[in-house]
Each structure stands twice: as structure tokens, then as C-alpha cells.
């Protein structure tokens, strides 16, 4: 190890292990470390080190950003304990050495994934810089997870292996073993089944032209399929794959939109597939479009198995309408270890505006400009005292209540529940390990309202999040709290169903829905 590298080693370890007594001092130390890194980038006389120095100079923003991510985790993650903190420190030191001389953009991205995955926060994510060409390439075939096994779920026309064939090996190694050895390090969620499902989804993209070998079982024989990561991310949505038909495809659909699909199952039975909990405007759609279709159904099935989550309040509002319990409050769901809140909330508001996310309407964002401008200053971790934080948070909350018309929403709920009086209906909810975020909370609400859950545990990845923009223009999502239900942590456990049912590969191939079959046979 050269003197320069040894100096960098010492200063990096100093960053990791010195106890920081204030965030102001902490920020100064980070800046000091970065300055040392930059100073030592050009101090070798050898050609080899000069070439590596050139890469390090080009990677300066990534080096700084990895340090930023490390500091954000240390400051805001509610999931740190002695074991996780030790793993975080070791992983940061390992990756900070790797990233300095890494030229592959895809690998650089994975280093941020790895650092995030250490803290076991299933709600975390890293997003590549917006507006740039991502280094992600997809396979011309896809695999999925069901009941402990993996199978071919879609493919291009020239692939002859039958859909639904079980994947038994990857690169001549047992599938599960390969995923644990090569993919698990990128996966933050640890909930059973959600973890396995996330691994196989993560396998579907990698760096350009990387090759991979799949071995499927077809008619009791092993059949190999060699593939290349060749489809750019920007094109993947335009590729027409052959897919296994969904079991929804054979149901009688009577309504469809971005937010909902309604199916008439049989006389007096309706299935409402809720695709997301994204936007308060979907409450208007639910009241005006969906409820009139449900009046003649005594049995309602709410399906959130493929729900992408977002805002828990939306799900709670839907349940209030359906049950008629418009004044109910859920006290069994609470938060724990909520870290310093104001800075990430302000930074998140700034990120929402900067990236044009459609979660807050434009007029409201304009009125929040004062707070958003404060967020630019807060990036230096110049935190306020707790009492001052609470005061400003209350101002923001009141502002959002006023301009996002929350009070009007409550009035709509009460009016709809009284008008349609559908709360005497039998309600069942289908859950899955694929549905987290607001779906975890939705399942909690159902438990409190004695609504039966059928399916698997939810994903176990919920809670308020902060969005942090890094120097290299990556965006990072971090949980800011632990969410508890009846004093049990939801993270990496999920909410358990009343009746556990999981699809098998045969169910999926045959368009058979065991959850729906159970309801029809037992009600």
C-alpha cells in the first residue's frame, strides 16, 4: 500500500469510527476527508497510479456521494443497531476503496445498492440520475417466483422453452444458491418470500452484453438457455413479450382504469383490484365510478396483491367508505425511533419539486417554496432544535391539509358512506409478499376493522420516507421511522393473513387463483 493510499485509509477509518458530537462538526469532517481524497488524487510518479488517479478524479462526485449516503444513513435510519452499524461501517470502507477507481457506471450504481442493503430497510431505493442514459440492460426473457420456486414468466418469440418451465440452475449453479451468492447483497427487504421475489426481479437487469446461462426443467429434462443483457432500459417497455396469461384475464371485467379494475365474479360477488394508492383524486373516482357498481354485490373482494403502494391515507379512506366507520381512528399502528424529521422532509419536498413528481399538486408546491428553499440550506445538516422542528412541521402539515383539501376529503367520505350505505357487505382482502408500503398499512387497517385477509404476509416495507439528492445526481430513498402494529415491528415481517395461501407454478400456468377459489368455496 502506498503512502497516499495508507493516508486515505487512515482518514476513511477516522470518518467511520470517531464518535460525532454534533452534526456541524460531522459535516466539517466529511468535507475534510473529501479534501484529503482530492489532494491525494495526483501524487504518484508512476504511470499506473496516474491512470488510476485519472479515474479517481472522474469519480470524485461518486466518492463524495457515497460519503453523503453513509452520513444520511447514520443520521436518519431508524434501523441501526450495533450489528448493523458495524456491518455498515465495514461495507462503507470496502466500497469507498472500490468506487475510487471504478470506471463501470453499472458497478458504481451497485455500490450504492450494496450500502443501502446493509441496513435491512425494505423501503429504501437508489435511483439513477434523472435525464441520463442509464447503464441498465435487460434480458429477452423474464423469470418470476412462486412458492419457493422460480419459473419462466415471459420471453421473446424466438425462445422455444415453454412458459412456466421451472428454473433450476443459473450459470450451472443451483438457482437459490446463485441468487444468495450474487444477488442478495443488493436486496434490502428481508421478509420471507418478498426477499426471494426481489432477488429474481433484480437478476433481470445488469450491464450491457453481460451473458448468463439459465437451465430449465422441461419434460423432466434439463434444457439450457444462454442469454445476453441486451435490451436498454429505455426500450424495455416497448418490447412485446410472450407472457403467461393472468388469471384476471378470464374474469368478467366491468370497469378498468389506472387505479382500479372491477370484476363481476358471480351473482352478488365483486372483485375490486386496487392497482395503487397514489393520488387523492382516486377517492373521487371510487365514490363516483366504483361504488355504484358495488351496490348489488353482497360480497366484496379487495385485491391488493399487485398494488404498488404510495399513500396510506387513500387506503384508509376506501375502507372508511366501505365499512361506514368514517370516524374511526387506528391507535394500534404507531411509529418508533422516528429520527430527526425536518431536514429529510424539507429535502424531500425539494426533490419532489426538482424531479416533478406528481404526488403534490403544482399550486401547492409553489406555495411551499419558502420551505423548499429552506431545504437547500438544510442539506448541510444545520439542524434545528426539536421544538423548532415540531413547530415548522406543524406549519407544513397545516399547509398541506389546507391546500390539498383534506377536510373536504373527510366530508366526501362521510357523504359517500351515508349515501350508499354499503357497510353491511362482507369484505375480504387478498394480500401478497409483493405488496408493501401503503399495502402494509392497509392490511393493518383491515385487521383493526376485522376484515379477513387471505394470501401471504405483506412485503414488510412501510413508513414515512425521505428522498435525498446526492452530489452525483443519484436520488436515495430512506425510511425515517419504524412502523409498529400492536407493538410488533412491520419491517421485514409484514402483516400475516388470516388464511395463508400462495400460488404455485401450476396455479399460474393454469390461470388458477387459489385465493379466489377459497372464497367462493367457503362463503
Kindly give the residue locations of the regions a language model identified.
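Bacterial N-terminal signal peptides that target proteins for export
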Residues: 24-31
